[in-house]
Amino acid sequence: GVKRVVGTDTSARALLCAQDNVNRLNMGKQITLQQSDLFPEGQADLIVCNPPWLPGRPASTLEQAVYDQDQHMLLGFLSGLSKHLAPKGQGWLILSDLAEHLGLRSRAALLAAIERAGLVVLERLDTRPIHPKAKEEADPLADARRAEVTSLWRLAVG
């Protein structure tokens, strides 16, 4: 199993919430949290990133969890991953294709960014949403949400 987890976030508020969860689960010896942009120092066998799913400019702190301005987190994760992975390590990218259904990013652009970063896709595991919004007809994004797939992209240095 995993002996040590380092979690990072740029938001002090998000880190406080995460620390509350770490404490509640009594995982303080295994999990440390750092305020950092993407990667902690050093290398790791596994690095997981769940960036905001939509390219766009957040208008509030809350929207920073939804909108990734200039795709900073997504592209930063991909471009910095090889430097931070231990030999034979993997990067796991958790990403919805909602942006593709809304015409905000193409699958080809995502695959090109992966390739530019010198990474290869080992596997992609997909799941469809089961949350209530996926079935809400009044939602203006109902068609896109019904078509949405969230994927775990297993990446490695090529």
Give the ranges of each region predicted by the language model.
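Conserved SAM-binding loop of SAM-dependent methyltransferases across substrates and taxa
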Residues: G1-K3
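C-terminal lobe and adjacent flexible extensions of AdoMet/dcAdoMet transferase-like proteins
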Residues: W153-G158
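S-adenosylmethionine
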Residues: T8-T150
